[in-house]
């Protein structure tokens, strides 16, 4: 009886240890991916019909060929070398991600993108499409009405207004899974955990925490990315074990702060704790104005010459007033950005200054360009 009480106490203590988080700890499930448990990309080609004159134009030949092939499957024979000119049809590519573990009969969302020169997919219907994996096998069938978030309006004069992207749409639950992708998750004796942010310290902390929770030799850190875990072979026991595994609290260690910016959109994201060493910053604003005009040369009426036009370019470069900003050591980057903004700098200027600070060794952070 006393042995049973001790066993119960052990399970209670283990449960409390798994539930109660430590300082700055995170659940293991948010830090790692399980090797072999991942999504797979699917792709297909088909036609969207029912468009209100916004489909592919005559110069897109493969749309007419696809339409003729489809009609032939339904017993409709077109004359040879006849190009069906239809404005209500668009050739499209279909893409989707098959989540891990999905089986036959389940539905997934799909994205429909125009391949030709269609103006809009709004109001169209996707015809039955086979979605294939990288191995060429068919894993899903797609069909349905396309939902488009963008719109394009065009007047008789040729002027047009476009909001968002009308040539890309989605079909929620538009594909039905017909074949499940096999996984080796239940086959191997070990489960491999891949860290989302590789770090030797984080990998070691994961192994130590799992060994404390489930016993010695349960987990072994293989590298800065991989941690090998011994798991039960029985399917039910393995699922229960993995559910406990995901809730184990891990001290991932301090991650190096990051500065991320997108050069295309001008977006700048600064992580917490980014510091700057002592530096002096000077950034000149350059404005380039280029004006193009054509000069007409009219010859003498009796000279027999021809009237010609010659292009003339007027380029003007204006340099703004430079200001030198002194940055003391230990300054938070947020303060520097506020100072730069007060000088009227654009996001492009901020990105240029951050790159210069990084190259000068004055930025204590990882610089990521996307």
UniProtKB/Swiss-Prot annotation:
Q: Where is the signal peptide?
A: 1-25
The keyword Signal is annotated on this UniProt entry: yes
User: Which biological processes are named by the entry's GO terms?
Assistant: bacterial-type flagellum-dependent cell motility
Source taxon at top rank: Bacteria
* Keyword Signal set for record: yes
Record InterPro entries: Flag_FlgI
What keywords would UniProt list here?
A: Bacterial flagellum, Periplasm, Signal
- Localization annotation: Periplasm; Bacterial flagellum basal body
Under Gene Ontology molecular function, one entry of this record is: structural molecule activity
What GO CC terms are in its UniProt record? bacterial-type flagellum basal body, distal rod, P ring; outer membrane-bounded periplasmic space
Pfam families to which the protein is assigned, alphabetical: FlgI (PF02119)
Disulfide bond positions: none
- Family label: Belongs to the FlgI family.
Q: Which HAMAP family match?
A: FlgI
Q: Tell me, in a sentence or two, what this protein's role is.
A: Assembles around the rod to form the L-ring and probably protects the motor/basal body from shearing forces during rotation.
Record text on subunit structure and interactions: The basal body constitutes a major portion of the flagellar organelle and consists of four rings (L,P,S, and M) mounted on a central rod.
Q: Which PANTHER family does the protein's record reference?
A: FLAGELLAR P-RING PERIPLASMIC PROTEIN FLGI, FLAGELLAR P-RING PROTEIN
Protein's name according to its UniProt entry: Flagellar P-ring protein 2
Q: Its encoding gene is what?
A: flgI2
């Amino acid at each position: 009886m006393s042995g049973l009480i001790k066993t119960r106490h052990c399970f209670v203590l283990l449960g409390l240890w798994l539930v109660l988080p430590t300082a700055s700890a995170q659940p293991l499930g948010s830090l790692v991916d399980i090797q072999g448990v991942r999504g797979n990309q699917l792709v297909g080609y088909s036609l969207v019909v029912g468009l209100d004159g916004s489909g592919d134009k005559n110069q897109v030949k493969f749309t007419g060929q696809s339409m003729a092939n489809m009609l032939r499957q339904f017993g409709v024979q077109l004359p040879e070398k006849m190009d069906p000119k239809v404005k209500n049809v668009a050739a499209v590519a279909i893409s989707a991600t098959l989540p891990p573990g999905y089986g036959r009969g389940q539905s997934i969302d799909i994205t429909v993108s125009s391949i030709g020169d269609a103006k809009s997919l709004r109001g169209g219907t996707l015809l039955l499409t086979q979605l294939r994996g990288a191995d060429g096998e068919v894993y899903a069938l797609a069909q349905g009405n396309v939902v488009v978030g963008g719109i394009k309006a065009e007047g008789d004069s040729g002027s047009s207004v476009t909001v968002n992207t009308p040539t890309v749409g989605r079909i929620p639950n538009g594909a039905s899974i017909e074949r499940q992708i096999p996984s080796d998750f239940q086959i191997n004796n070990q489960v491999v955990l891949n860290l989302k942010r590789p770090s030797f310290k984080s990998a070691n902390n994961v192994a130590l925490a799992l060994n404390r929770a489930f016993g010695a030799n349960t987990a072994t850190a293989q590298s800065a990315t991989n941690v090998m875990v011994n798991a039960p072979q029985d399917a039910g026991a393995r699922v229960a074990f993995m559910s406990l595994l995901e809730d184990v609290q891990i001290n991932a260690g301090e991650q190096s702060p990051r500065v991320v910016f997108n050069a295309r959109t001008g977006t700048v994201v600064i992580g917490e704790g980014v510091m700057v060493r002592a530096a002096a910053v000077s950034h000149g604003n350059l404005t380039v104005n280029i004006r193009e005009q054509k000069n007409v040369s009219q010859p003498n009426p009796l000279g027999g010459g021809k009237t010609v036009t010659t292009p003339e370019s007027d380029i003007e470069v204006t340099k703004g007033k430079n200001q030198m900003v002194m940055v003391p050591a230990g300054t938070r980057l947020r303060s520097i950005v506020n100072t730069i903004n007060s000088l009227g700098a654009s996001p492009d200027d901020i990105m240029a200054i951050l790159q210069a600070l990084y190259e000068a060794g004055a930025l204590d952070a990882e610089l990521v360009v996307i």
